[in-house]
Amino acid sequence: MRPDVQWRLCWENELQLPDHLELSEFFRKTYEPTGAFNGKQFEGGRSWAGARPELRVIGYDVHGVAAHLGLLRRYIKVGDVDLLVAELGLYGVRPDLEGLGIAHSISVMYPVLQQLGVPFAFGSVRPALRNHVSRFCRKGLANILSGVRVRSTHPDVYLDLPPTRVDDNVLVLVLPIGRSMSEWPAGTLIDRNGPEL
């Protein structure tokens, strides 16, 4: 039986301190099983990991936050082409609801993507999530690009690390919104020009 999830679409400046605290707890519990550092970045009420989203879709049920997806419009560089996209990230589903799937979050976000008039939405996920996102892509709304590296800045300055990092072990998810997939630029390197969402 599908849980009764109510979706809230909110701009970042509409969130209040209790919202950030609840989301921070949600992200710690959702991301810690993938590695202690992944949960640590949400300590102290922080409800974002790298870049801060401008818009969020938050699913709630009787137990609190059930799911989350963030959006940030930005220009990325694909090969030699500058491209406006809506980056989708900070995706999470509470562990007891893992069957809820990314399709539910994106279906709530999709009309907003159309209203924003962006040509594409894009995000990157760990290869371990291939089956998870493949189910969504079978519906024809998105495409998985493999063999694409993604360069990002670190969200903070670390004296022992270079200012950028390149992920060459990610899957890139592209949703054509205002353009067709055939208009996505060719290239094997995406430069975020900032931290990951």
From Swiss-Prot:
GO cellular component terms attached to this protein's record: cytosol
InterPro entries linked: NodA (IPR003484), Nodulation_prot_NodA_CS (IPR020567)
Molecular function GO labels: acyltransferase activity
Keyword Chloroplast: no
EC number: 2.3.1.-
Keywords: Acyltransferase, Cytoplasm, Nodulation, Transferase
Location in the cell: Cytoplasm
Gene3D superfamilies: 3.40.630.30
Pfam family, one: NodA
Primary location recorded for the protein, binned into one broad class: cytoplasm
Role summary: N-acyltransferase required for nodulation. Acts in the production of a small, heat-stable compound (Nod) that stimulates mitosis in various plant protoplasts.
Family statement: Belongs to the NodA family.
NCBIfam families: nodulat_NodA (TIGR04245), PRK00756.1 (NF001974)
The protein, known as: Nodulation protein A
Highest classification ranks of the organism: Bacteria, Pseudomonadati, Pseudomonadota, Alphaproteobacteria, Hyphomicrobiales
Designated gene of the protein: nodA
